Amino acid sequence: MPLSGTPAPNKKRKSSKLIMELTGGGQESSGLNLGKKISVPRDVMLEELSLLTNRGSKMFKLRQLRVEKFIYENHPDVFSDSSMDRFQKFIPTVGGQLGTAGQGFSYSKSSGGGQAGRSGSAGQYGSDQQHHHQGSGSGSGSGSGPGSGGAGGPGGHSGRGGALPDNQAGGEGKHITVFKTYISPWEKAMGIDPQQKVELGIDLLAYGAKAELPKYKSFNRTAMPYGGYEKASKRMTFQMPKFDLGPLLSEPLVLYNQNLSNRPSFNRTPIPWLSSGEPVDYNVDISIPLDGETEEL
């Protein structure tokens, strides 16, 4: 007799053919693009800092802006065109040339006896960009690139300089641009030149003669009554009462009984009643018949 109600559905067995196709297809599809695998932690950090989606990247960007603002506000004369003449003493003597628009200087030194053109420039805040140019050939010559200092060529507007082509440069050598964008505020205030800095030894811990401070009268730490002390003494109407002090009498020394047995005990431990030390006699009648039976029984 069949049971009443809806019969349970038959459980279908999952086919393993589909699983085999998926596992086998992964080996054949070698052209699948899974993206770039970043294995260097530095790339990951730079990518996260450039997204500006989390709090850390925003704080990093604000810190960069604060640093640039601090450098520009504390040394505004360094980045102005009118003050670039002061940097002439920092330029090397070999092939040096100052650029005013790009705010940098360039020099070149070659091993083949010649000097090749070298240029460089700094950005808005004096970024130390270095441009290398390898010169090859024979002969000697000297010159400056069309973008020297960022003023003589197309590299002047964007803050980048250019160098001479290979066919115009003579000798072989490595050209490096050096930027002097930091000036110590101590050296700037004292007017010390680089030559004097080597010869002169400055001891910043040596203190000079201390100037004598003016002797001002301080009213903050003095408790002065209203009107001064003279008026305050006249307004004083309270007088201390006069009383006769009797002779000083020494208090009698009280000796307490140090017998520990007579001292009361305030311990919380339940202690039974103790005797006072006197012998206690109990009269017990021991005239009991030895028989177990008496006359009453």
Curated annotation (Swiss-Prot):
<dbReference type="GO" id="GO:0005634">
    <property type="term" value="C:nucleus"/>
</dbReference>
<feature type="compositionally biased region" description="Gly residues">
    <location>
        <begin position="136"/>
        <end position="162"/>
    </location>
</feature>
<dbReference type="GO" id="GO:0051373">
    <property type="term" value="F:FATZ binding"/>
</dbReference>
<feature type="compositionally biased region" description="Low complexity">
    <location>
        <begin position="118"/>
        <end position="128"/>
    </location>
</feature>
<feature type="region of interest" description="Disordered">
    <location>
        <begin position="1"/>
        <end position="34"/>
    </location>
</feature>
<keyword id="KW-0966">Cell projection</keyword>
<dbReference type="GO" id="GO:0031433">
    <property type="term" value="F:telethonin binding"/>
</dbReference>
<dbReference type="GO" id="GO:0003779">
    <property type="term" value="F:actin binding"/>
</dbReference>
<feature type="region of interest" description="Disordered">
    <location>
        <begin position="105"/>
        <end position="172"/>
    </location>
</feature>
<dbReference type="GO" id="GO:0015629">
    <property type="term" value="C:actin cytoskeleton"/>
</dbReference>
<keyword id="KW-0597">Phosphoprotein</keyword>
<dbReference type="GO" id="GO:0031143">
    <property type="term" value="C:pseudopodium"/>
</dbReference>
<dbReference type="Pfam" id="PF05556">
    <property type="entry name" value="Calsarcin"/>
</dbReference>
<protein>
    <recommendedName>
        <fullName>Myozenin-1</fullName>
    </recommendedName>
</protein>
<comment type="function">
    <text>Myozenins may serve as intracellular binding proteins involved in linking Z-disk proteins such as alpha-actinin, gamma-filamin, TCAP/telethonin, LDB3/ZASP and localizing calcineurin signaling to the sarcomere. Plays an important role in the modulation of calcineurin signaling. May play a role in myofibrillogenesis.</text>
</comment>
<keyword id="KW-0539">Nucleus</keyword>
<dbReference type="InterPro" id="IPR008438">
    <property type="entry name" value="MYOZ"/>
</dbReference>
<comment type="subunit">
    <text>Interacts with ACTN2, ACTN3, FLNA, FLNB, FLNC, LDB3, PPP3CA and TCAP. Interacts via its C-terminal region with MYOT.</text>
</comment>
<dbReference type="GO" id="GO:0030018">
    <property type="term" value="C:Z disc"/>
</dbReference>
<feature type="modified residue" description="Phosphoserine">
    <location>
        <position position="82"/>
    </location>
</feature>
<comment type="similarity">
    <text>Belongs to the myozenin family.</text>
</comment>
